[in-house]
Swiss-Prot record:
Protein name, as recorded: Regulator of ribonuclease activity A
Functional summary from the UniProt entry: Globally modulates RNA abundance by binding to RNase E (Rne) and regulating its endonucleolytic activity. Can modulate Rne action in a substrate-dependent manner by altering the composition of the degradosome. Modulates RNA-binding and helicase activities of the degradosome.
GO cellular component entries: cytoplasm
Record has Cytoplasm as a keyword: yes
InterPro entries: RraA, RraA/RraA-like, RraA/RraA-like_sf, RraA_gpbac
Subunit structure comment from the entry: Homotrimer. Binds to both RNA-binding sites in the C-terminal region of Rne and to RhlB.
Gene Ontology MF, one: endoribonuclease inhibitor activity
GO BP term (any one): regulation of RNA metabolic process
Main location: cytoplasm
Keyword Nucleotide-binding tagged: no
Subcellular location, record wording: Cytoplasm
CDD domains: RraA_family
Length: 170
């Protein structure tokens, strides 16, 4: 399904929070949405692997990597695991790597930028706790909507199915 964050913002202006425009698309799917699962970690991918081994149908993994630009928190293997387990997307306050492989996968991935250096495989951090970056506090079970224009979050699901790419707000 295609989500149009611009139209969703117009319709639900009083309901949604808009994430500051700091992130770029890296996955093969530019538009995605789902229930937020949060991870807070710094230059470590162990908790990310653990989370993505679970069924991710209808979910988006939101990783607060502290904005680190020194190590990538998502690589092709991690993204493939997410696809295999049905995750809708991954949003990273940090870096990704292997971008040519990521763009071929049927998953939404947004991150600050790319770097070739991988992160450590330790399980240090927090799972399903509130995280704050890009001007927004993300809570577990928030609903995240993303497209090429940006990312918004809502405490409740929005009626996005009523929207199409050709819809316009008067």
């Amino acid at each position: 399904m295609h989500y149009n964050t611009s139209l969703l913002c117009d319709i639900y202006a009083d309901t949604v929070d808009v994430v500051e425009p700091l992130l770029t698309n890296f996955g093969g799917r530019n538009s995605f949405a789902g229930e937020v699962v949060t991870i807070k970690c710094f230059e470590s991918v162990g908790l990310i692997y653990k989370a993505l081994e679970e069924n991710g149908l209808g979910k988006v993994l939101l990783v607060d990597g502290g904005g680190s630009l020194r190590r990538a928190l998502v690589n092709a293997h991690i993204a493939e695991l997410a696809v295999e387990n049905g995750w809708e997307g991954i949003v990273v306050n940090g870096c990704v790597r292997e971008v040519d492989l990521l763009e071929d996968l049927d998953i939404g991935i947004q991150a600050i930028t790319a770097i070739p250096v991988g992160a450590e495989d330790t399980q240090i951090g927090e799972v399903n706790s509130p995280v704050n970056f890009a001007g927004v506090t993300f809570l577990p079970e928030d609903i995240l909507y993303a497209d090429s224009t940006g990312i918004i979050i809502s405490p409740e699901p929005l009626n996005a199915e009523a929207l199409t790419e050709s819809d316009e707000i008067a």
